[in-house]
Amino acid sequence: MAKWYVSAKKADFAAIGAKFGIDQVTARIIRNRGVIGDDAVNEFLNGKISDIADPALLKDGQRLVDILSQKIADKAKIRIIGDYDIDGVMSTYILVKALKRAGACVDYMIPDRVKDGYGLNVHLIDKAYEDGIDTVVTCDNGIAAIEEIAHAKELGMTVLVTDHHAVPFEDIKGIKIYKESKADAVVNPHQIECSYPYKELCGAAVAWKIVILLYRKIGIDEKESMDFIENVAFATVGDVMPLTGENRILVKAGLKSIHHTTNIGMKALLECCNIEAENVDAYHFGFVLGPCVNATGRLDTAKRALELFLCDRQEEAMRIASELVALNDDRKEMTAKGVETAVEIYERDNYEKDRVLVIYLPDVHESIAGIIAGRIREKYNKPTFILTKSEDGVKGSGRSIEEYSMYEEMCKCSELFTKFGGHPMAAGLSLPQENVELFRQKINEYASLTDDDLVPKIHIDVPMPVDYVSMRLVSEFSVLAPFGKDNPKPVFADKNLRVSRMWVVGKNNNVLRLSLISSYGTPINAIYFGDIESFFDYIRQRFGSDAFEAAQRGRFNNIVLSVVYSPKINVFRENESLQFEIQYYK
């Protein structure tokens, strides 16, 4: 059973509310997001692009641009090597368009997920050399490509790295020894010597900052770099970066830009997803548009997604966009089957004792391993690796919980992998098939997770009676957007809510509506999108079958609930009303 926690962070909420013209509840939520002090609150509410740090603070940023501008002047052949996910596609798009604007002789290559794997490899370096490429520029990859970059340097090539992933290291007797490549310049805010104040940038944001420095260097108006702000925002949300600090500013600016997008490919994708440009928010980036871009890298080639955004003909853009949507539909079906198989294995093969799950699904397409890992992590609240058979052994992806730094834990058994990399919350790996069971054993031996770490935790912003909620307050919550990682939609809790009626609706009978009455007698319209059968089982066990039947018929009963809820304004036939979405109950 999940534990409910109320955020108890202190501040003078009345003073904050008065100073910034917001309700005390809104002020409390902002404090719960770790925003402290008037300057920080002002940036949270009113942050502008002009408030973000100078990209010149990025270690090697100016050096990279000095080299790149000279290569452009020399008409040297430059190749951008990106990645096959949304961040890699957007990073590549930004650099290709910007370098062409700067007069560069530039092309691009996005690795094939199955044939090439993640990031740089020797094959891609050799192909670039055969094609007469002088300079390789990486984006959203390269920080861990130590051997591959060494190979490129042996061939006499220039290598410029832009990345945002964790810097690889060896753990020698508890001391981290960071690895460095022989690249001519490395730009990554996670480097120890990097003085850039905000570290949580995605690859596209790092690439965009290089564009700003490049335009500054060669005399192009820096304002032109704002042409890419919607791509930066798209990648930031799609790559599940924290929507805090600078990222929050970038995403807000990007959403404003996309409401008036001129990109033919983006317009086509919006049309195929039945979304009006002026209605796009972070949810659409993360859960509708982003998965369509990622689906190409998973099941086909991410080059197709990049071609969509580079496209200048509407007919072609609509064709590609419709293909992306169809691929994503296929991905959804494959994912559902993979999750079902993983659950069967967990329940059959004594995985309950494992604190870290390593599940081998040889028949699952390697591109959806990460999605399946995320679903299994959500179900069991355990760090999860999903492994699958590949052309040269086993590949996999991991998704973690807050209490477990996945990449650091993998470093403790790095000898088992042929390749690995990632973040605290996610990772990718390759290993020989004979190491699969050993990996499961070792990663669990090293895990120091406690029983409490593995209990799901529900964080409540404010314990607030539903009676306090008003249309005005819910409307005000829009100042908290965009919502996403580290800035979730606010949730509240109330108790002693009596169920007067409950009934199932929806085309697939997968939505539960409830009429509730507060302890003060206020009638409430509520909705629940979770597991309805589990909810019904709880009601029967806790209150009895008679009460359950009475509630379904709208008759008096003894069912009283405590709920975690999120209020919103429901619009039906142009009429607005308050609706309470139940997240959890007990």
Mark where each language-model region is.
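Short, well-ordered strand-loop elements centered on a beta-strand within folded domains, enriched
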Residues: 175-178, 183-185, 392-400, 523-527, ...
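Active-site cavity-forming subdomains of large catalytic enzyme subunits
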Residues: 126-204, 208-217, 227, 244
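Hydrophobic helix-and-loop "lid/oligomerization" segment in the mid-to-C-terminal part
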Residues: 5-135, 154-156, 174, 182, ...
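Short, glycine-/Ser/Thr-/acidic-enriched flexible segments
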Residues: 85, 142-144, 166, 191-192, ...
